[in-house]
């Protein structure tokens, strides 16, 4: 199966799904991560990062999708995922990516114990020659 057909299938399924949203209660934080898919001849690749080790970071040293907390400047969680991805690895999803849809949010259970709902946002990377520039939060 060609990767473009796989992306089309993923996009169609995301468009046709009913996303169950987590109820956000007062004091609870929201975050978004970007699941970035890149078509290759052999199939799809997904972009992961290795978070830098940092004292006090509940996700320190873990493999992750780029993303982070929703800020007041973010219109929605798609914008959060785009902003955080650009900040963390220099990838501008507004230019190099195509938004495919959202997955259901999940409650995170960080070691720090605070309440957080993380919602994955799915993108297709359409430009294969995009250089990544990790910031200090990313080991690789």
Task: Locate predicted features.
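Entry/capping segment at the start of metal-dependent catalytic domains
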Residues: 1-25
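Short N-terminal helix-initiation segments at or just after the protein's N-terminus
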Residues: 10-13, 60-69, 85
């Amino acid at each position: 199966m060609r990767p473009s057909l796989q992306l089309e299938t993923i996009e169609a399924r995301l468009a046709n799904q009913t996303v169950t949203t987590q109820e956000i209660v007062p004091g609870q934080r929201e975050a978004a991560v970007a699941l970035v898919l890149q078509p290759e001849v052999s199939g799809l690749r997904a972009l992961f990062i290795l978070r830098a080790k940092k004292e006090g970071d509940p996700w320190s040293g873990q493999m992750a999708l780029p993303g982070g907390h929703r800020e007041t400047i973010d219109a929605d969680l798609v914008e959060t995922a785009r902003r955080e991805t650009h900040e963390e690895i220099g990838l501008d999803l507004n230019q190099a990516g195509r938004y495919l849809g959202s997955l259901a949010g999940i409650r995170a259970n960080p070691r720090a114990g605070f309440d957080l709902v993380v919602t994955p946002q799915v993108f297709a990377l359409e430009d294969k020659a995009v250089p990544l520039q990790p910031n200090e939060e990313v080991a690789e």
